[in-house]
Amino acid sequence: MRTHTVDHPLAAALLTTMRDERTPNAVFRAALCDLTGILVYEALREAPVDTYEINTPVAPATGARLAQPPLLVPVLRAGLGMVDAAAGLVPDARVGFVGIARDESTHQPVPYMESLPEDLAGVPVFVLDPMLATGGSMRHTLELLAARGATDITALCVVATPEGIATLERSGLPVRLVTAAVDEGLNENAYIVPGLGDAGDRQFGPR
């Protein structure tokens, strides 16, 4: 599995804003939106394009557009804050949804909804989730996508852990990871250290 960690001063500054426990919800959401844009930019760096002819106000020119916009799949609820930024950069993208909660006693993912196209053969997919902790939620999402024929999947995560990366590598599922940071690991409660806290709560308030 390929892992690309974004190395950019703006990404580092936005990540710092998100990490800071003093950051208000609205500022956290804005930083997540901006950082998502950077992750999408990096994820599309090698995307194939189609060329076509246009006319500028001065002369004819050859333009470019994405050959196939990705399907965006936010993992609810934390991934919801990444959708607008991703769709803003790729306005032709479709959006699917996967809902997964966390069992606080077992630290295991608890799926509760999915809304995805039935046939994803040949369709690039971007999974949006701010945090790759144990990797359980991401693995479940990847399994849903692979069962529908997806073979070109990119996970966009603000922070990841070695444990989460290992989970994806062991899964054998077709995925690459684009992240702003690989953190130290997980604590006894399976929270990322130093991490962001609960990304859903920090965007929308406690459940």
Swiss-Prot record:
**EC class of this enzyme?**
transferase
Q: Which domain of life is it from?
A: Bacteria
Q: Where does 5-phospho-alpha-D-ribose 1-diphosphate bind?
A: 77, 102, 129-137, 198
Gene3D superfamilies documented for this protein: 3.40.50.2020
Q: Which Pfam families match?
A: UPRTase
Q: Which residues form a coiled coil?
A: none
* Catalytic reactions of this protein: UMP + diphosphate = 5-phospho-alpha-D-ribose 1-diphosphate + uracil
- The UniProt record gives the binding positions of uracil as 192, 197-199
One biological-process term from Gene Ontology?
UMP salvage
Q: State which pathway it belongs to.
A: Pyrimidine metabolism; UMP biosynthesis via salvage pathway; UMP from uracil: step 1/1
Question: What molecular function terms (GO) are annotated for this protein?
Answer: GTP binding; magnesium ion binding; uracil phosphoribosyltransferase activity
Keyword Magnesium belongs to the record: yes
- Its Enzyme Commission number(s) read 2.4.2.9
Q: What is the UniProt remark on how the cofactor binds and its stoichiometry?
A: Binds 1 Mg(2+) ion per subunit. The magnesium is bound as Mg-PRPP.
- What family is this? Belongs to the UPRTase family.
Q: What is this protein's function?
A: Catalyzes the conversion of uracil and 5-phospho-alpha-D-ribose 1-diphosphate (PRPP) to UMP and diphosphate.
Q: What is this protein called?
A: Uracil phosphoribosyltransferase
Native organism is Nocardia farcinica (strain IFM 10152)
